[in-house]
Amino acid sequence: MRIDCLPALQDNYIFLLVDVEQRQAAVVDPAEAEPVLAALQAEGLTLTAILNTHHHGDHVGGNRRLLRQFPEAAVSASAVDRDRIPGQTVLLEAGDRLQICGQTAEVLFVPGHTRGHIAYYFPEVAEGNPRGALFCGDTLFAGGCGRLFEGTPAQMLDSLQQLRSLPDDTAIYCAHEYTLNNLRFALTVEPDNFDLQQRYQAVAIARQQGQATIPSRLDIEKATNPFLRWDQAALQAAVSSQDPVQTLARLRSRKDQF
């Protein structure tokens, strides 16, 4: 399975999953249809599946147009979002598995950003890609996490704990190019984190050159993303709490005002 990253809207990424041998593809969080249709046409691919992580318009905005072109494509999303996903045909629960482009995707229930948010975890992808791939929408970002629009800090902590427990070499495919600003914030709460300092410098150069910072990798996030470091003493001191939920809540509140 090949994974292509398609820029969309202002700062979104759409992910096209390609089975080269079968000439088929699936798409994760199509913010808009046009980049997807162009990529499919360029290679003569048939779209067989749409995977939505949550209901926000910049993640489902392309569903209807894609279904007009490929009406047989299955649309998968959380059962919680059954009335909020255009064209949904597959209602997913935690622990469900899907066969996508010859690979198995495991469904993780990760509420917090929204009440129905899910992530798709592929334990194995094709040769040339990392050992696993996580498509996490707006739950986990490179250097950050999503705002709590519908969920609680406790829910988000539980969701991030699930993601943090995946193998360290898991590739993190989040849906927005927020990395540089996220790392700027991270430096305000962990200014002495050497790994974070180094990452910020590398990301700043990459963005100056117009390069994407996605995918990230889980071990990098665990070393530099404050929202996966709620149990680190330096970070707890920065927010004056040793309680994991309160630590995450205070971090999120600070980031909202950053």
Curated annotation (Swiss-Prot):
Recorded GO molecular functions are:
hydroxyacylglutathione hydrolase activity; metal ion binding
* Stored InterPro entries: Clx_II_MBL (IPR035680), Glyoxalase_II_hydrolase (IPR050110), HAGH_C (IPR032282), Hydroxyacylglutathione_Hdrlase (IPR017782), Metallo-B-lactamas (IPR001279), RibonucZ/Hydroxyglut_hydro (IPR036866)
- GO annotation (BP), single: methylglyoxal catabolic process to D-lactate via S-lactoyl-glutathione
Q: Which residue spans adopt a coiled-coil conformation according to this UniProt entry?
A: none
Q: What is its EC number?
A: 3.1.2.6
Query: What keywords is this UniProt entry annotated with?
Result: Hydrolase, Metal-binding, Zinc
**Positions annotated to bind Zn(2+) 1:** 54, 56, 113, 138
Query: Which reactions does this protein catalyse?
Result: an S-(2-hydroxyacyl)glutathione + H2O = a 2-hydroxy carboxylate + glutathione + H(+)
Pathway involvement of the protein, from the record: Secondary metabolite metabolism; methylglyoxal degradation; (R)-lactate from methylglyoxal: step 2/2
Q: Which residues bind Zn(2+) 2?
A: 58-59, 138, 176
The cofactor named in the record is: Zn(2+)
Per the entry, the cofactor note is:
Binds 2 Zn(2+) ions per subunit.
Q: What class of enzyme is it?
A: hydrolase
Q: How does it assemble?
A: Monomer.
What PANTHER family does the record tag this protein with?
A: HYDROXYACYLGLUTATHIONE HYDROLASE (PTHR43705), HYDROXYACYLGLUTATHIONE HYDROLASE GLOB (PTHR43705:SF1)
What is the annotated role of this protein in its UniProt record? Answer: Thiolesterase that catalyzes the hydrolysis of S-D-lactoyl-glutathione to form glutathione and D-lactic acid.
Question: What HAMAP family does the entry give?
Answer: Glyoxalase_2 (MF_01374)
Q: Which family does it belong to?
A: Belongs to the metallo-beta-lactamase superfamily. Glyoxalase II family.
Q: What is this protein called?
A: Hydroxyacylglutathione hydrolase
What is the source species?
Answer: Synechococcus elongatus (strain ATCC 33912 / PCC 7942 / FACHB-805) (Anacystis nidulans R2)
Its ancestry begins with: Bacteria, Bacillati, Cyanobacteriota, Cyanophyceae, Synechococcales
